[in-house]
Amino acid sequence: MPDIITIGREYGSGGSKIAKELAAALQIPFFDKKLIEIAAKETGLSEEFIQEAEQRRTSSFLYNLSFSSRNLPVSDQVFIAEADVIKRIAAEGPCVIVGRCANYVLRDQKNCLRVFIHAPIADRIHRAKEEYGIPADEVQACVLKHDKARAAYYNYCLLYTSPS
């Protein structure tokens, strides 16, 4: 059995719930939003700021520049902090890690199972409406917006670590 399990997922697919249940069944630590909390403590940035930076990874150059304190855009600082946390957690022992491009960050990690959870759009819309209380007239746009943001985040991480 692999020591580390990374789970990527589409918004509304139930991936986080599946990951949490898997970690409980295997009796190993589960990391999802806890990664943001750890990265916030290590960088001195607030959890809210890190979440905002994740949402803006591909957008404004001026946004990145205006909040940068170490000659790196804030998006890069956040990615580096999260990647460091993911690598350290993986080195500490078996666990389930959800999102944050953990599958890519740990691409060279041996004994790591990488899983991606997806579901039909109609099921994801229904789940988002029921679990998150998103109004019926907004839920489809919300699901698609999250899909687009996650794809942009993942592409940002790939580009950030790719050799020039």
Label every model-predicted segment.
Residues P2-I4:
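Pre-Walker A (Motif I) flank of P-loop NTPase domains
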Residues I7-I18:
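Glycine-rich phosphate-binding P-loop
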Residues K20-L26:
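A conserved segment at the C-terminal end of the G1
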Residues F30-A40:
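Short beta-strand-centered segment that lines the nucleotide-binding/catalytic pocket of NTP-utilizing
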Residues A40-P94:
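ATP-dependent small-molecule kinase phosphotransfer cores
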Residues N111-K129:
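Conserved phosphate-donor/acceptor-positioning beta-strand/loop module used by diverse small-molecule
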Residues C142, K148-Y156:
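C-terminal accessory "lid"/substrate-recognition subdomains
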Residues Y160-S164:
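Conserved small/polar residues in nucleotide/adenosyl-binding loops
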